[in-house]
From Swiss-Prot:
Its main location: membrane. It holds the Pfam family vATP-synt_E. The keyword Coiled coil does not apply. GO terms for cellular component: plasma membrane; proton-transporting two-sector ATPase complex, catalytic domain. The keyword Acetylation does not apply. The gene is atpE. This is A-type ATP synthase subunit E. It is found in: Cell membrane. One of its GO terms (molecular function) is proton-transporting ATP synthase activity, rotational mechanism. SUPFAM superfamilies: V-type ATPase subunit E-like (SSF160527). Has multiple subunits with at least A(3), B(3), C, D, E, F, H, I and proteolipid K(x). Keywords: ATP synthesis, Cell membrane, Hydrogen ion transport, Ion transport, Membrane, Transport. InterPro entries: ATPase_E_C, ATPase_V1_Esu.
Length: 198
């Protein structure tokens, strides 16, 4: 069935209208994510320091081996080991984040839904959440007329996935997706602390 030109025009109009809002929302989301992470900073800071120390030891070991070897193949293997160590660090950080369900978590869920509805340009949405978050999400939907909670839970550490009711647009605002979007920046920061170029 050929695409409906009216639907395409409507989607284009929505995308044009909300372009700046999306960019602004992304900036706000980044700020909110930073604030949410700062809220659990003490716990995460201790874990972060321990993980960074483990990573530093692993990176120092890798760095000494790279400096001692002129063989490019050996260096590439060492970089692969560093990537593995970084992946372990990221997994531990993600596990720490997923375990957090502090008093600010319901506000974060409401903010994620608000960001998604603003980005999609409608509150007529279907919100999907993990089984752990269904009650929190359901309680947050009162502020979004026309929004409804999907019955089937999704596999995620937290957050929400929001779709327009017709399914044409979706915003993945799960902790998993947000973390995946931040991984390259986190990876770059960790690598730069050890002075190893990848």
């Amino acid at each position: 069935m050929p695409p409906d030109p009216r639907l395409e025009a409507a989607v284009d109009k929505i995308l044009d209208r909300t372009g700046e809002e999306i960019l602004s929302g992304l900036g706000e989301s980044r700020k909110e994510a930073a604030e949410a992470l700062a809220g659990s900073a003490k716990t995460l800071e201790r874990e972060y320091d321990r993980i960074v120390e483990e990573g530093r030891k692993e990176a120092d070991k890798i760095h000494r081996k790279i400096v001692g070897s002129a063989d490019l193949e050996a260096r590439n293997k060492q970089i692969l080991l560093l990537e593995t160590a970084i992946d372990r660090v990221l997994e531990k950080v993600l596990a720490s984040i997923s375990a957090e369900r502090g008093p600010g978590y319901p506000d974060m869920i409401k903010s994620l839904i608000g960001e998604a509805t603003a980005t999609l340009g409608t509150t007529q949405v279907v919100v999907r959440a993990g089984s752990r978050d269904k009650d929190v999400v359901q309680a947050s939907l009162g502020g979004f007329p026309g929004a409804e909670l999907a019955q089937e839970p999704i596999e995620c550490l937290g957050g929400v996935k929001v779709s327009s009711k017709d399914g044409s647009m979706t915003l993945d605002n799960t902790i998993d997706a947000r973390f995946d979007r931040m991984k390259p920046l986190i990876r770059k920061e960790i690598v730069s602390k050890f002075g190893i170029g990848i």
